[in-house]
Amino acid sequence: MEIIKLREEFIKLGQALKAEGLVESGVEAKEVIQDGFVKVNGEVDTRRGKKLYDGDIVFFDGTEIKIEK
């Protein structure tokens, strides 16, 4: 499991995927999110701007990312 430490109150879903190097660009993040390949807390979420907070878990392409404060 990868961990993203929040510097602010939240991080957006597309930014989290880019920060972990799971996508190369914002355009790629938008595509994989809108196509339903990303889960947030166990459910598919198609909003690139979805705000992730402490305790949220993202799953994409075999990688799990935990958001921590």
For the regions a language model picked out, list residue spans one by one.
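A basic, amphipathic helix-loop patch mediating RNA/tRNA/ribosome contacts
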Residues: 9-51
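Short, low-complexity, polar/charged sequence segments that are solvent-exposed and flexible
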Residues: 23-25, 58-61
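A detector for short, charged/polar N-terminal pre-domain segments
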Residues: 1-11
